[in-house]
């Protein structure tokens, strides 16, 4: 009986007030009604037993079950409630005369619930009152419905009168418990039935899916077998299955003519000459085959049956359960003859297919949706296609004409050669050769495994003008693609994969393509523009509408392999994102694809080319690198000395300092920057000249001057007192100077020509005091670190180019001729103005027998703070004046010591940094014009009250090599990251408690950054260096 009450609701009334059952007083007390029990409850007679339960030990109260007696079964004190049961005709749980706890009959139990119809229970506030039949107005609740049937539940609701149970809170609770108990079983029963139904549906659907899968697997196996059989069949281009059908048709021809079975549905509209096969009677077959019909009709019928079954059955089988669980939809059956009337090629009756396990009957048709053949042309069903990987061509006797459904790719490679026609253009015109390999590439990717060509090329058949400039050539049709990934874009530059083999041939790609021819001879290393080119550098002609560089007629001839009609998009409608810096693009090709950017906003006629520059001379190939190890000087060619003549001393008129910059000098400066000379060599030479010119000699004489005086030219004249020098000495030194000056002019190390040197008097070497014992090994090592730079002499007179000099006359004493012949002094740079020269001087490739005849103080380079490398040197300029000792002559050891001191004053750390980060210099040189335009757009540089320059900021990626940041030390990156993170998160940072400082090295790096930030007035730093924060 206890199982019947397991699902009863639990009412918690542990918070009851007053009259609680005291277990200490009546722990095992027994109470009985009219018939006393023995502690377990009376079981006979009219009485009901009640056994008191202990609340602490969770005792249960067993009620008597005697005939007619009111049984009461107590529940767990803590977990369950009292469930009072009332038998008909008997009293409730409490006896009429006695109450529990003191005669008033108030059971103040905190948890019990009474099921009796008459006894009221106050669960939360009190117990049963000590009055018999307290709730006489309580009525019987209707019976619980046995099922969820609509009629039963409706009857239950009609019998339930809710108005009778709203008079007190106890009745409402009683009604709630009853309804929960009543409908809980109904809900569980309905849920179980739903789960059972869903399980059955899932099992049925799984069974149907398995059947469909098996059927489709069988169909795919048949199709695969037919395909495999057709791969090795070359007789008629069809498989063995069709041959077997042909054999069956020949054997059972009479059977096919008299076939009565309906095997395939036909549309309602039947063309003339065809038989209505839907009647199913013999009379409907009057228009069938006759004895004179040819067997080709049977063969064509077999073709139609196979293609319809394989194509339609496979496609509809995969949609079997997508639409109406595989059932046939009447509206899904198209009228094939109405849409594609040419597909219905069956004249006569159809027949069964022995390849399948079943006949094509009405049952088979109803299980599939009939769809039209998915081909653009019905003739494509019967075409035989060549396998791409097959080297041989299949023979088809049915249809000999092949179908090419893909556009063949045209592979083209062009090699530019110099035309035989003479160059008759004016000096203002430039060559139409455009270095496409360097000007039309993208900076973001490397050179792809292929080439880019123009569409204005040539074929081998027709000779038409190539462009408006009159360049003879031929047109070529390229594939409509600018990149390998965009096959439908408008062609501007066509991507050509690497199709050129080592023997210089290009394989034929299209069907029936022309045979390849060997490549044309390569271009010479130097042409009219002075651009260095090799055999792999592509040159294309420029159109007059596409660029402002107008070429002369007949300048170049561009040849190609295959071609067609020319395209319409101009060549220069594509603009690269960044100029290309590819030092060894001609040494190797990679397979990285190239991305081009098309400019839509600008018309082609407004497009101009970027400035041409000799990148090949700046970045030399590896095999042309010069060994910097110092060796013996090159032997000078023997020249015939002519008889020297005695010259009189001639005083030069002292003139003013170098004039200010004029428009002509500014033009010369721009030409020097934009000339075809060696830009990187000039930069390095200028750096070394600044370093060498700002060196303080070790002599005791020094002239202090201000910064403004340094900017003016200070020269030393070449005048020597004639009366103090014997004629023999003068003649000897003059001839020696002439020979040496000529040699220097050839090598580019000296700035004066031989003819000009002959007209100048001989100057004695300056005396520079120093220690005679010099470190020869250190001097040689310093010389070896200096890179050699090839240069060419200036063809103009120095005074005419750079203006007159200021005369400072020095009169040395008599020279020793024997020492003069044995001297070995590397010469100093002679005459340098602030204008960037076209000639570059270096100290590493000069001869040993040269005289320092002229010294000029070098001012700082005016690069608007873009030359980051030479900034430190120019800012720390010192006042220099040559030593003017006139007491003693300079010995060879003194001169070597002086030169050694000069070389050691050059910052070797800066030179090492430049050599390690050559890409930075290359990037700065390449983007000099762009960076200058950005800086000039921010406004001119003006000096503030302190005399410092106002600098502007720009992205560091434009002036720095990103690899410097990528290859940064991990510890430095961690310290910088932690430092800036602390500055952002905290208003004030304590260095003693900084988590990113682990050792002294971290603290050193952190304080270095802190001092830089403090100098830039970004942070505030305490006097002891412990606390810092953002301003």
From Swiss-Prot:
Keyword Phosphoprotein on entry: yes
Recorded GO CC terms: chromosome, centromeric region
Biased composition (Basic and acidic residues): 85-95, 328-342
Keyword field: Centromere, Chromosome, Developmental protein, Differentiation, Meiosis, Phosphoprotein, Repeat
Location of the protein in the cell: Chromosome, Centromere
Organism ancestry: Eukaryota, Metazoa, Ecdysozoa, Arthropoda, Hexapoda
GO biological process: cell differentiation; meiotic cell cycle; meiotic sister chromatid cohesion, centromeric
UniProt-recorded name of the protein: Sister chromatid cohesion protein solo
Principal location listed in the UniProt entry: nucleus
Skewed-composition ranges (Gly residues): 38-52, 60-83, 96-129, 281-290
5 X 7 AA tandem repeats of [FS]-R-G-G-[EQ]-G-G: region residues: 93-127
Compositionally biased spans, kind Acidic residues: 1-10
Gene: solo
Bias-annotated ranges (Basic residues): 638-652
Purpose of the protein: Isoform solo and SMC1 function as partners in mediating sister chromatid and centromere cohesion in meiosis. Not required for sister chromatid arm cohesion or for mitotic chromatid segregation.
Entry comment describing in which tissues the protein is expressed: Expressed in spermatocytes.
